[in-house]
Amino acid sequence: MGSALENYVNQVRTLSASGSYRELAEELPESLSLLARNWSILDNVLETLDMQQHSLGVLYVLLAKLHSASTANPEPVQLIQLMRDFVQRNNNEQLRYAVCAFYETCHLFTEFVVQKNLSILGIRIISRAIDQIRQLETQLTPIHADLCLLSLKAKNFSVVLPYLDADITDISTVAAECKTQQQQQSQHADANNDAKYFLLYFYYGGMIYTAVKNYERALYFFEVCITTPAMAMSHIMLEAYKKFLMVSLIVEGKIAYIPKNTQVIGRFMKPMANHYHDLVNVYANSSSEELRIIILKYSEAFTRDNNMGLAKQVATSLYKRNIQRLTKTFLTLSLSDVASRVQLASAVEAERYILNMIKSGEIYASINQKDGMVLFKDDPEKYNSPEMFLNVQNNITHVLDQVRQINKMEEEIILNPMYVKKALGSQDDDLTSQHPKTFSGDPTD
């Protein structure tokens, strides 16, 4: 081991032993280039450090290894095991002094396992990393997006769904606080990507909910992504907008309400999503055949955007919506008539749709197998059972909790010095913009 690396080890040991973690965290970024240049002997450095006692020192060695991964081509299993050991054994107290480096390490690790087609091996590791670094279960961190990406690549959603189901009440601002430091130490330029990882979390989250057919929640995630305040459009927001339009049709049969203050949508997104707006317009005609033609017409564009599967779900939703319309008009109808009226290929296909809709609670009906007649029924729920009462009570409690959280967040904003300064500044601007009246006569006139 060279003298420079020996100095690194001694520095880590000395400052860690004295509990000078802040000082160590401020000095270690300067050693990152040194560690990266000596990537071939970094395992020797790790042998002299303890993951629990010297977590900051091990973190930067791991970060250097991941920075060098593209050129060094390390053994994937060995590097994955090292990352797994680190997130399981590190000292969480020390990590608080180098959150940006920890985030960057997780981002690079995610890129590495995705490139090696080993995404499934990274899911539990990044999940553990999130649990370590977040301060609340409802806090969003930049590495939430990494967990979503790994889950999408691996097509495994069991781990990520509990994170997505938690409504966000706080966003990690540690990376933002590091930006001043980043101007001096450019090694952690990734910390400037707060907005990108915020958008990616809601974009990937919407895709995951779409994959598990939780379309209501998917619509909410895409809506957050496209309505995030922005002066210019990002590619992430554009792709989310395309999916937002299609999921809107599945959930509501039309474009879901979009706040008027999202000017970036009308100015930039709509002109770049013409195919999707054509799809919306045709859907409004309730003609399954016309919808099939428009999907076929734009199949190349939908496939290029990885939205062809979603387009097929839109077509399926129109068949279902047209069947639901029949329940409001007819009491009984033959399967062949159902197929004819909703433009399905056969009575067998109509029966399959109706049975699936009965099973999912989308309609209430029964099929007489002898004569092939469908009997449409009213909703059997009378809303007077103990279970329904308990459900209403739980919903009320949930809403009241949300109201309390919103009031708390509003109070924090109102008391924020930056907000107060900006609000007072706006009032001063309003006062100065009102030109004083020029008095040529009686000032009371």
From Swiss-Prot:
Classification via PANTHER family: 26S PROTEASOME NON-ATPASE REGULATORY SUBUNIT 3/COP9 SIGNALOSOME COMPLEX SUBUNIT 3, COP9 SIGNALOSOME COMPLEX SUBUNIT 3
One GO term describing the cellular component: cytoplasm
Composition bias, Polar residues: 433-445
Gene: CSN3
Residues annotated as domain PCI: 217-381
Taxonomic source organism: Drosophila melanogaster (Fruit fly)
SMART domains from the UniProt entry: PINT (SM00088)
Function summary: Component of the COP9 signalosome complex (CSN), a complex involved in various cellular and developmental processes. The CSN complex is an essential regulator of the ubiquitin (Ubl) conjugation pathway by mediating the deneddylation of the cullin subunits of the SCF-type E3 ligase complexes, leading to decrease the Ubl ligase activity of SCF. The CSN complex plays an essential role in oogenesis and embryogenesis and is required for proper photoreceptor R cell differentiation and promote lamina glial cell migration or axon targeting.
Region Disordered, residue ranges: 426-445
Entry similarity comment: Belongs to the CSN3 family.
Assembly information from the UniProt record: Component of the CSN complex, probably composed of CSN1b, alien/CSN2, CSN3, CSN4, CSN5, CSN6, CSN7 and CSN8.
Subcellular location: Cytoplasm; Nucleus
Keywords: Cytoplasm, Developmental protein, Differentiation, Nucleus, Oogenesis, Signalosome
The protein's name: COP9 signalosome complex subunit 3
Domain of life: Eukaryota
Any single GO BP term: protein stabilization
Pfam families: COP9_hel_rpt, PCI
TM region(s), chain numbering: none
Main location: cytoplasm
